[in-house]
Swiss-Prot record:
Topological type in the membrane: Lipid-anchor
Binding site residues for Mg(2+): T36
Motif (Effector region): 33-41
Propeptide: 179-181
Domain of life of the organism encoding this protein: Eukaryota
Residues annotated as transmembrane: none
Organism: Bos taurus
Name under which the protein is recorded: GTPase RhebL1
Lipid moiety-binding region (S-farnesyl cysteine): C178
Source lineage: Eukaryota, Metazoa, Chordata, Craniata, Vertebrata
Length: 181
């Protein structure tokens, strides 16, 4: 029974990340929340014929200068890394966090889904989709753009990270239980 833990790290963009997690689990957009509180969500997701019990730990956020706790590395099999398309700085921070994760895993291939959130705010866009695609390709990761407000691809993000884990590990194992951070 392999333990699959997925980590969602989102520096400086707590509203976008939290709203994405809440939209995925609760099916509604979260306007207000406390960004300093770590939250846990659970949801059952079906991929093909398999059922996965996802446990999402919505972290209070990290920045490029933070020391990553071992809980973000040890026993974690996949990551959803989210930045805001309206913030170039958040995109740059995600690059730095990925490098720390990659080094922490011994530079092995990581199942990662890179998500450009807030796609509904196109007039305020600072990061073009092509930049996200290029960065994800350099990592061997999947790239998606989403909008928590419009519920655009929120389910697909978590389905994709499960598929990425399976692809990298080449096996789902007997029990499909995912812990998301």
């Amino acid at each position: 029974m392999p333990l699959v833990r997925l980590s969602q790290l989102v520096p400086l963009l707590l509203k976008g990340k939290t709203s994405l997690a809440h939209q995925f689990v609760e099916g509604e957009f979260l306007e207000d929340y406390d960004p300093t509180v770590e939250n846990t969500y659970s949801k059952i997701v079906t991929v093909g014929k398999d059922e996965f019990h996802l446990h999402l730990v919505d972290t209070a956020g990290q920045d490029e200068y933070s020391i990553l706790p071992y809980s973000f590395i040890i026993g974690v099999h996949g990551y959803v890394l989210v930045y805001s398309v309206t913030s170039l700085h958040s995109f740059q921070v995600i690059e730095s966090l990925y490098q720390k994760l990659h080094e922490g895993h011994g530079k092995t291939r990581l199942p990662v889904v890179l998500v450009g959130n807030k796609a509904d705010l196109s007039p305020d866009r600072e990061v073009q989709a092509v930049e996200g695609k290029k960065l994800a390709a350099s990592w061997g990761a999947t790239f998606m753009e989403s909008s928590a407000r419009n519920n655009q691809l929120t389910q697909g993000i978590f389905t994709k990270v499960i598929q990425e884990i399976a692809r990298v590990e080449n096996s789902y194992g007997q029990e499909r239980r995912c812990h998301l951070m």
